[in-house]
């Protein structure tokens, strides 16, 4: 009798596992389908929609590394700033970008920066150099890592992408930079900047 029960259990296990796997796969497919159909979305206050035709009418430029050259691309845009530069950065150790920010401050451009907390201990971070130049620098503290790479220029240009503002990003890594000239998009990024500044930053 015991032998028959063991045989029944042994035969049942594959069936149970197979059924469970089938339910899992079917459920995964169902929820993936829902997400792909955009039935699931963040609240409208947290997500902005821009159609491809809409963006195609904007002035959009891109830069990729390798080869090197995206730092120069960013510096050129910073040199064109007339009124304001708002930056969010995880890594901030590139001398050329730092110099461009300081020069902008010296010619009367409002420069405000939010950096990840790692810059407090990073050996090559330009945090204190920026601070000494009287630039408004804040540390984005919570939650987690402040991994944004964003520059908003004159409230009408947005530079973003994977590119940290470091030498490694320009010389060693495979990175991308995108520049979009659009006032509505810039406003969206600015709102996020001020939100981060108000709730999650330590001011020097």
UniProtKB/Swiss-Prot annotation:
Entry EC number(s): 3.1.4.4
Biological process per Gene Ontology, one example term: phosphorus metabolic process
GO CC annotations, alphabetized: extracellular region
Annotated Pfam families: PLDc_2
Catalysed reaction, written as an equation: a 1,2-diacyl-sn-glycero-3-phosphocholine + H2O = a 1,2-diacyl-sn-glycero-3-phosphate + choline + H(+)
Domain PLD phosphodiesterase per the UniProt entry, residue ranges: 142-169
InterPro entries (alphabetical): PLD-like_dom, PLD_domain, PLipase_D/transphosphatidylase
Cystines in this chain: none
Signal peptide extent: 1-22
CDD domains for this protein: PLDc_Nuc
Active site: 147, 149, 154
UniProt GO molecular function: phospholipase D activity; RNA endonuclease activity, producing 5'-phosphomonoesters
Subcellular location: Secreted
Claim: Hydrolase is one of the keywords in the record: yes
Protein keywords: Hydrolase, Lipid degradation, Lipid metabolism, Secreted, Signal, Virulence
PANTHER family, per the entry: CARDIOLIPIN HYDROLASE, MITOCHONDRIAL CARDIOLIPIN HYDROLASE
Job description of the protein: Could be a virulence factor.
Record family assignment: Belongs to the phospholipase D family.
Subunit relationships: Homodimer.
Protein name: Phospholipase D
Protein species of origin: Rickettsia typhi (strain ATCC VR-144 / Wilmington)
Taxonomic classification: Bacteria, Pseudomonadati, Pseudomonadota, Alphaproteobacteria, Rickettsiales
């Amino acid at each position: 009798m015991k032998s028959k029960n063991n045989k029944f259990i042994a035969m049942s296990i594959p069936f149970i596992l197979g059924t469970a796997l089938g339910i899992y796969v079917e459920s995964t497919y169902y929820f993936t389908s829902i997400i792909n159909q955009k039935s699931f979305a963040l609240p409208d206050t947290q997500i902005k929609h821009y159609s491809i035709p809409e963006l195609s009418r904007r002035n959009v430029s891109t830069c990729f590394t390798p080869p090197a050259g995206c730092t120069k691309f960013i510096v050129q845009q910073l040199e064109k700033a007339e009124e304001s530069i708002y930056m969010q950065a995880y890594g901030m150790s590139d001398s050329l970008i730092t110099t461009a920010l300081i020069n902008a401050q010296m010619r009367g451009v409002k420069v405000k920066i939010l950096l990840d907390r790692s810059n407090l201990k990073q050996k090559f971070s330009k945090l204190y150099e920026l601070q000494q130049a009287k630039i408004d620098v804040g540390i984005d503290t919570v939650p987690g890592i402040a991994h944004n790479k964003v520059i908003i220029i004159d409230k009408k240009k947005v530079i973003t992408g994977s590119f940290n503002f470091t030498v490694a990003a320009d010389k060693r890594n495979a990175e991308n930079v995108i520049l979009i000239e659009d006032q509505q998009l810039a406003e969206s990024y600015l709102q996020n900047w001020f939100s981060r500044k108000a709730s999650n930053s330590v001011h020097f």
